[in-house]
Swiss-Prot record:
Protein name as catalogued: Malonate decarboxylase acyl carrier protein
Family according to the record: Belongs to the MdcC family.
Leader sequence segment: none
Pfam families according to UniProt: ACP
Compartmental location: Cytoplasm
CC terms in the record's Gene Ontology section: cytoplasm
Keywords, alphabetical: Cytoplasm, Phosphoprotein
Maturation and modification: Covalently binds the prosthetic group of malonate decarboxylase.
The organism's place on the tree of life at top rank: Bacteria
Function: Subunit of malonate decarboxylase, it is an acyl carrier protein to which acetyl and malonyl thioester residues are bound via a 2'-(5''-phosphoribosyl)-3'-dephospho-CoA prosthetic group and turn over during the catalytic mechanism.
Main localization (coarse): cytoplasm
Modified residues (O-(phosphoribosyl dephospho-coenzyme A)serine): 32
Source organism per UniProt: Malonomonas rubra
Length: 112
């Protein structure tokens, strides 16, 4: 099935989740070795749902560990996240997602 994108779905819950402030947020761009993160505030009983679309196959466990760590560190909840990946390394994934969540949690950000 060459040419088809891989779709992964995860659900995480932090111990003390904090809702994001922004109702919607877009961060990054799908470019070579990078990714975009789309966040949408959504009632999930404190959980975080993440959908990853990537051309890379066979690294589901790596995605799960990286995403779980970032969500745990960010202590967010009630947000649906979509990640559109273009061969980003785990370090780039963690950085971009952490940046997006930090901005979405910040009350100083303006809503577009």
């Amino acid at each position: 099935m060459e040419g088809m994108l891989n779709e992964l779905n995860f659900k995480f819950k932090s111990e003390n989740p904090v809702d994001v402030v922004l109702p919607k947020h877009h961060y990054g761009v799908v470019g070579s070795g990078d990714l975009e993160v789309l966040l949408k505030k959504h009632e999930l009983e404190g959980a975080v749902e993440i959908r990853v679309v990537s051309p890379v196959r066979g690294f589901d466990h790596v995605w799960e560990k990286v995403l779980e760590k970032v969500i745990s560190d960010a202590e967010v909840g009630n947000v649906a996240i979509e990640i559109n990946d273009n061969n980003a390394t785990p370090v780039v994934v963690a950085l971009r997602l952490a940046q997006a969540l930090s901005e979405a949690k910040s009350a100083e950000q303006s809503v577009n």
